[in-house]
Amino acid sequence: MARIIDGENKNLIGKNLKRIRKKAKMSQQDLSNKLELLGVYVCRGSISRIEDMSRTVTDIELYAIADVLSVDLKELFE
């Protein structure tokens, strides 16, 4: 598991988010659009930065991402 504070990794879900999103055959833009329908505004570029772990993720974004991808929240952390 990535260290929580290491100067580079700003979240713990990036790699899993990318894997789960691709498994769902969803583009970053698709994910962004679906999040927007829930009132959570995360642009495609921000999703890219989340996936490469260079951007933090809010708790609201986490719950919305799990909802859009139809996964349990803990799956994003495994």
Question: Each predicted region: which residue ranges?
Answer:
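A detector for short, charged/polar N-terminal pre-domain segments
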Residues: 1-12
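Short basic helix-loop element that most often maps to the first helix and adjoining turn
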Residues: 15-36
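Conserved hydrophobic/aromatic packing and binding residues within compact polymer-binding modules
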Residues: 17, 31-32, 47-50, 76
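Helix-turn-helix DNA-binding elements, focusing on the entry/boundary residues of the two helices
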Residues: 17, 28, 44, 59-62
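Recognition helix of helix-turn-helix/homeodomain-like DNA-binding domains
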Residues: 37-56
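DNA major-groove recognition helix of helix-turn-helix/homeodomain DNA-binding modules
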Residues: 54, 58-75
